[in-house]
C-alpha cells in the first residue's frame, strides 16, 4: 500500500508536468504494450493512468499495439536477405521482397505516430522478448536509420519522442547495489 501511495503521488506530479508539454506537439500516439499479464501488470496499469491523464483535456489519437496479440514476422532467411539487399543496394528476390513488405507495413505504422508510449516490464533483468522482436522489426536500414562511410550512422526519424514506463519487481536504481543487474533501462 505504501509503495502504491508514493507511486500515485509521484505519477501525479509527472503527469501534470508532461501534460503541459504534450498538447502542442502531438496528436497521434502509438502505445506499445509489452506485458502479457494485462490487468495484473504494473507497467500496463500505470500506462493506462498516464494515457487517461494526458488525454483528459486533449484529443489524442491513441493506437495500442499489444505485442502478445500482434503478428510479428520471423527474421528468417528471406527477411535477412532482404535486409542485406537494402544495405548493399542490390536487388532482392520476389520472396525476399514479400518478406520485406511486412517490415515496411509495421514500420509505417510505427513511423506514423507523433509520440510513442512504451509500457515495459522487467523480465529476467531485461525486456520481454516480444518487445525486442518488435524493436528489431522497426529498426531497419533505409527506414529508421542510414549509414554512410562519411557520416556513419544517422537516425531518419527526427522530431519524435517517447515516454517509457518501466516496472520491475525490485529496485535497481543508483545506490541500490543492484545497478549492474538492470538491463531493462539501458537497453531501451
Q: Where does each model-flagged region fall?
A:
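N-terminal beta1-alpha1-beta2 submodule of the flavodoxin-like/Rossmannoid cofactor-binding fold
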Residues: 8-12, 21-129, 133, 140
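FMN-binding flavodoxin-like domain, especially the glycine-rich phosphate-binding loop
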Residues: 102-106, 129-130, 136-188
Amino acid at each position: 500500500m505504501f509503495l502504491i501511495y508514493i507511486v500515485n503521488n509521484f505519477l501525479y506530479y509527472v503527469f501534470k508536468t508532461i501534460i503541459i508539454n504534450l498538447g502542442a506537439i502531438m496528436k497521434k500516439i502509438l502505445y506499445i504494450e509489452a506485458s502479457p499479464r494485462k490487468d495484473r501488470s504494473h507497467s500496463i496499469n500505470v500506462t493506462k493512468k498516464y494515457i487517461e491523464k494526458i488525454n483528459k483535456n486533449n484529443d489524442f489519437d491513441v493506437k495500442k499495439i499489444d505485442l502478445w496479440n500482434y503478428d510479428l514476422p520471423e527474421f528468417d532467411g528471406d527477411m535477412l536477405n532482404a535486409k542485406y539487399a537494402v544495405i548493399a543496394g542490390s536487388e532482392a528476390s520476389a520472396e525476399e521482397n514479400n518478406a520485406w513488405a511486412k517490415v515496411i507495413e509495421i514500420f509505417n505504422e510505427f513511423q506514423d505516430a507523433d509520440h510513442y508510449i512504451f509500457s515495459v516490464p522487467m523480465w529476467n533483468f531485461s525486456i520481454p522478448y516480444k518487445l525486442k522482436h518488435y524493436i528489431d522489426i522497426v529498426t531497419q536500414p533505409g527506414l529508421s536509420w542510414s549509414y554512410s562511410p562519411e557520416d556513419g550512422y544517422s537516425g531518419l526519424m527526427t522530431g519524435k519522442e517517447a515516454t517509457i514506463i518501466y516496472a520491475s519487481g525490485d529496485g535497481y536504481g543508483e545506490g541500490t547495489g543492484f545497478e549492474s543487474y538492470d538491463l531493462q533501462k539501458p537497453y531501451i
